[in-house]
Amino acid sequence: MEKKRFVLVHAVCHGAWSWYKVKTKLEAAGHCVTAVDLAASGINMTIVEEIQTLMDYSKPLLNFMSSLGSDDDKVILVAHSMGGIPAALAADIFSCKISAVVFLAAFMPDTRNPPAYVFEKLIRSIPREEWLDTAFGRYGNPDCPLESALLGPKFMAKKVYQRSPIEDLELAKMLVRVNPLVTNNLAGARSFTGEGYGSVTRIYIISGEDNILPEDYQRWMIRNFPVKEVMEIKDADHMAMFSKPKELCALLLEIADKYA
């Protein structure tokens, strides 16, 4: 298979570290892989209070995309969970540098509504008690507050990592950080463009046993903004890169072969 370039975008409170299994497997298959830490994530030194906009949160990803020259191969952008919104922003700005965007159990914006619409729609429907020990906070202007979260260990065990190896859950407990939530106040009202983000090939990978982004909501997002292809990992929890890494990598290699 021809060498392809993957760029991996992590979930809220996580970091590039969450892709360690997938990165290893894709590189072993001969591909070039970059896993990005978004702002205030992983080893990125930004603190949450410095993040006032979606651009701020997405800056490391945007900087990487900007660094790619015209002679570089187009990338396959793979976004997980809330990372779907920064990935959509990158696709809107750098559509000419992207061969496909893969949404893995990810929030997938459309080109009609504000960027955070798909996140707000789900998040506001979940009763606070279902978040268990997750800690929420507010910062910034009291008249237009920004929101943050730190996923709790009980919540991760029950809702996020319930089918993943216990070692990966323990890793996450050690490494998760407070992150901004991509709400309307952070992302703004301006929707992504049809000429940019809307022009890029999109593929959605459904996690069939996802307890935080339910399958029916994943399918609603696909109906809301149809994609080129829908794939599914039936027994994956929200963290398919941990619970079903082989199956996920097989799909990513298939996508690379078809669309890159």
UniProtKB/Swiss-Prot annotation:
The active site is at S81 (acyl-ester intermediate), D210 (charge relay system), H238 (charge relay system). GO terms for biological process: jasmonic acid metabolic process; salicylic acid metabolic process. GO terms for molecular function: methyl indole-3-acetate esterase activity; methyl jasmonate esterase activity; methyl salicylate esterase activity. Pfam families: Abhydrolase_6 (PF12697). Keywords: Hydrolase. Transmembrane segments: none annotated. InterPro entries: AB_hydrolase_1 (IPR000073), AB_hydrolase_fold (IPR029058), MES/HNL (IPR045889). Its EC number is 3.1.1.-. SUPFAM superfamilies: alpha/beta-Hydrolases (SSF53474). It is an enzyme of class 3 (hydrolase). Putative methylesterase. Belongs to the AB hydrolase superfamily. Methylesterase family. This is Putative methylesterase 19. It comes from Arabidopsis thaliana (Mouse-ear cress).
